[in-house]
Amino acid sequence: MLHDVASCSSHISVQVGDGDGLCFHILRDGEMTGISFRGIPNGHEFTSLLLAILNLDGKGKNFPDESVCRRVRALKGPVHLTTYVSLTCTNCPDVVQALNAMTTLHPQLSHVMVDGAIHQDEVNALKIQGVPAVFADGKLIHVGRGDFGQLLSKLEAEYGVDESMTEQSIKDYDVVVLGGGPAGSSAAIYSARKGLKVAVVAERIGGQVKETVGIENLISVPETTGAHLAENLRLHMQQYPISILEHRHIVKVELDGKYKLLSTATGETFRAPAVIVATGASWRRLNVPGENDYIGRGVAFCPHCDGPFYKGKHVAVVGGGNSGIEAAIDLAGICSKVTVLEFLDGLKADRVLQDKARSLSNVEIFVSSQTLEVVGNGDKVVGIRVKDRNTGEERLISLDGIFVQIGLAANSAVFRDMVETNRPGEIVIDTHCRTNVAGIYAAGDVSTVPYKQIIISMGEGAKAALSAFEDRVRGVI
């Protein structure tokens, strides 16, 4: 395979020497780059190999903006990273490619991708039950889907940063949009088309959409994927003079006065008279004892990525909505038994999904079931403790894994003491996406708008942008 890759360019060569089998390193001008692969990077990881080569030649396209690159260079080293992957995992390449890019930027970083299927002895010894699993100098720091910004934040927390290399600055805009999903992208485009100076500050472009496998209800687009839609959102925004500032997380807001201040943990501050909050929502946690302790060791959120680790085993799916029942149907094809646990007295999933799940012989469904505890033996999950809400009876179900599928929670924490929110944490808006604070607007899943749908979020983002522009023209902000 490597010889085939090298045959594409006279600037690439392959040298075979002594060492571990199925392991190779990438060198540039005869010098080690810190990027290595233990396994054959085909399947979804073939792009990781190609992108690593392109990045080292200065032609890659997955580097973040200079401010984020500066954060990478400010990491205190040395840092030795190892990522265990499955070649069928759709989330693994994002993590591998992000860490390879960081390694390219920092001379004291190294990163090894390991195919867990080939090195099963290591997977067992490390008790890995979810991928991608990232180890930093032997310590597990990340499991599951992740993007450049999330991984960088974890490395900063683990190793610290050289403060002399960090950025302290204030950047001024007419409109700052928080979030890069359908609502945020729409708001940014509509604002830019009004001739305003616009910034999109987001953890990742696409938001929650990126985790959706198939999309068939975006009118005029019969079928697409979350990843494809996310990339199209980025491409559309790039058609306008919009500052796309990805891999940022706002930790402090100051909303008094005409100009609002939004600050990141790394010292960047954004200032604008209008802020459109389109931060979306994220997976809810059970918030029961044992859940956090066993994430990646039996507690999972993505059946597509982590399902293969439970082949022939008994798993539970907590949640009876569409995502939960879809997960149960998918897992039933590889697991010996799937137990669905729903808190309410009936399933919330579409009837067609319920009928399909009930037709499967290895799927059992329990409603009125409250999850009390994730039970483990110190190494991995061995069971789940539940209570029948009607009888009060408690029981322990012995199993091997738990997939949590209980919906989404609004990403509004940093604003909850600043603007009005409802009990679930959604930002309360009027029919024009205005909040109770002048100059602050909200759109999409983070707001109280009913029906959390992509197409609705796009419309809400446009509405928020038009409301902000109208208020600007009228002198309200």
Feature names for model-found ranges:
Residues 7, 104, 108-110, 114, ...:
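Rossmann-like nucleotide/phosphate-binding core characteristic of flavoprotein oxidoreductases
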Residues 10-19, 107-121:
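Thiol-based oxidoreductase modules, predominantly thioredoxin-like and allied folds used
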Residues 16-35, 123-137:
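Structural micro-motif
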Residues 27-60, 135-163:
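Non-catalytic, surface beta->alpha helical segment in thiol-disulfide oxidoreductase systems
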Residues 79-87, 91-93, 97-99, 104, ...:
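Beta1-alpha1 glycine-rich phosphate/pyrophosphate-binding loop at the start
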Residues 160, 166-172, 281-334, 428-431:
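Glycine-rich dinucleotide-binding loop and its adjacent helix/turn
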Residues 230-272, 277, 332-431, 470-477:
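A Rossmann-like FAD-binding core segment of flavoenzymes
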Residues 282, 287, 292-309, 398, ...:
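FAD-site-proximal beta/loop scaffold in flavoenzymes
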